[in-house]
Amino acid sequence: MPPWFRREKAGIRTTREEQNEMPEGQWVKCPETGEITNRRELEENLLVFPGSGYHFGMDSHQYFGFLFDDGDYDLHDTDLRSVDALNFEDRKPYSQRLESAVEETGQNEAVQAATGSVGGHPVSMAGMDFSFIGGSMGSVVGETVARAIKRAYTEGMPLITIAQSGGARMMEGALSLMQMAKTSAHLTRLDEAGLPFISILTHPTTGGVTASFAMLGDIHIAEPDALIGFAGPRVIRETIGSDLPEGFQKSEFLQEHGFVDMIVDRRRLRRRIIRLLNLLME
């Protein structure tokens, strides 16, 4: 614990009024080192913990805010809504799960599509939100990503996706699996147009998202220590009946084995993307 956070004198009391002035969650603890920092400092550091470099999760709007020039962007397809076509129910009906996710996140779905400029280059971008039903890909997520890709190749823009997902959305059955083929087919059109696709892989990126558009980029950028794979480590371990290699499915392991092109600290991500766009769009 930092010395400036340690109480030096016993018996010091704080009044109820002073306690109420302290914002909830003002102090944040690093899950790796146990160190503590101020939430404002953490937010100014793009949710990367000072010192340890631990990357906390971000939502799509937070990524858009620091990647687009001056944080200026236009959202698209926010009117799309998922429906419970199968009347699916596990612990609670899928329709209720959707309502809860919308209320808790303030988002319409697990992905947001936007256009704007990055380093002066017009860009089509799609960012996922893990907080919305685990960032799972259902029909609306697939359609939104497909439209973002189409927007890129019809308007002559590069594409950037920010993946964070638990995979296909089981509540939509085969409808969710169809999104893998849909997004992949649209990426073929983008490739035919000769436009670059930069895929950013954050923690975690798994399942059907990994098995489709997230791993079809021209350049794959991963955040440090991100879990990236198809099935999760526990499922694989139980299937093969043996322990996995150290760090298996982490971004560093994947880079070492050629599945990821580069690992970039979030604080340097925008600069790296601008350099890549300058090279690819010449």
Curated annotation (Swiss-Prot):
- Copy the pathway line from the protein's UniProt record: Lipid metabolism; malonyl-CoA biosynthesis; malonyl-CoA from acetyl-CoA: step 1/1
| Catalytic reaction annotation | N(6)-carboxybiotinyl-L-lysyl-[protein] + acetyl-CoA = N(6)-biotinyl-L-lysyl-[protein] + malonyl-CoA
Gene Ontology biological-process annotations: fatty acid biosynthetic process; malonyl-CoA biosynthetic process
Q: Which SUPFAM superfamilies does the entry mention? A: ClpP/crotonase
Subcellular location(s) of the protein: Cytoplasm
Q: State any GO CC term.
A: acetyl-CoA carboxylase complex
| GO molecular-function terms, A-Z | acetyl-CoA carboxylase activity; ATP binding; carboxyl- or carbamoyltransferase activity
> Is Cytoplasm included in the keywords of this UniProt record?
yes
Q: What is the main EC category here?
A: transferase
Q: Is Nucleotide-binding among this UniProt entry's keywords?
A: yes
One Pfam entry name: Carboxyl_trans
| Oligomer and partners | Acetyl-CoA carboxylase is a heterohexamer composed of biotin carboxyl carrier protein (AccB), biotin carboxylase (AccC) and two subunits each of ACCase subunit alpha (AccA) and ACCase subunit beta (AccD).
Job of this protein: Component of the acetyl coenzyme A carboxylase (ACC) complex. Biotin carboxylase (BC) catalyzes the carboxylation of biotin on its carrier protein (BCCP) and then the CO(2) group is transferred by the transcarboxylase to acetyl-CoA to form malonyl-CoA.
Family recorded in the similarity comment: Belongs to the AccD/PCCB family.
Identification of the protein by name:
Acetyl-coenzyme A carboxylase carboxyl transferase subunit beta
Q: What is the source species?
A: Salinibacter ruber (strain DSM 13855 / M31)
Q: Which gene encodes it?
A: accD
